[in-house]
Curated annotation (Swiss-Prot):
Domain of life per record: Archaea
A GO term for molecular function: ATP binding
Source organism (scientific name): Saccharolobus islandicus (strain M.16.4 / Kamchatka #3)
UniProt entry keywords in alphabetical sequence: ATP-binding, Nucleotide-binding
Residues the record lists as binding ATP: G15, M16, P17, G18, S19, G20, K21, S22
A Pfam cross-reference name: AAA_18
Name by which UniProt lists this protein: UPF0200 protein M164_1169
Family from the record: Belongs to the UPF0200 family.
Length: 188
């Protein structure tokens, strides 16, 4: 009896708010990857369980306090279900506990890709993108960055297997994303 063994590759996208994580995820989806946006998974739970007036970030913090630091990763893997994709992407990894949980649940073919943009560029993008949960005040954006860093996102970025710098035009960013994706798919 023989078994068909299919190896999937998993990309964990990390980066500060406004760095270009979602754009990278969109490009990966266009290449056929299954993409799960971690904040969407949290938002789904938030819509059911949040306390009145509770901010999304505070809700996520409370989830981690109750269920452990890897809870969002576990919820995302549950959301994945049975996937027949060769490449699975989790957009928005914020802590090493999440990275460890993904590796525990999905095996060793897990790669961290950090998207980096300078703060001035990120803040400009955030102010222009018009997401409902984005602040338009620089002081609030700086506070949000600090909250992300307290969660451990800086440690995840430091442990990245690949870093994509997003400080130029879209075509250059796309080229850099394609280069990293090809390297992950070819060699890991």
């Amino acid at each position: 009896m023989s078994y068909l063994v299919v190896t999937i590759k998993v990309i964990l996208i990390t980066g500060m708010p406004g760095s270009g994580k979602s754009e990278f995820a969109k490009l990966l989806k266009e290449r056929g990857a299954k993409v799960i946006v971690m904040s969407d998974v949290v938002r789904k739970r938030y819509s059911i369980e949040a306390k009145p007036g509770e901010r999304l970030m505070d809700f996520a913090k409370r989830l981690r306090e109750i269920y452990g630091d890897g809870v969002v990763a576990r919820l995302c893997v549950e959301e994945l279900g049975t996937s027949n994709h060769d490449l699975v992407v989790f957009d928005g990894v914020r802590s090493l506990a999440e990275v460890e949980e993904f590796k525990r649940l999905l095996g060793d073919s897990v790669y961290i890709v950090a998207v980096h943009s300078p703060p001035k560029i990120r803040y400009k993008r955030i102010i222009e993108r018009l997401r409902s949960d984005d602040s338009k005040e620089i002081s609030e954006l700086i506070r949000r960055d600090r909250e992300e860093l307290k969660l451990g996102i800086g440690e995840v970025i430091a442990m990245a297997d690949y870093i994509i710098t997003n400080d130029s035009n879209y075509e250059e960013f796309k080229r850099r994303c394609e280069e990293v994706t090809d390297r992950v798919l070819k060699n890991g």
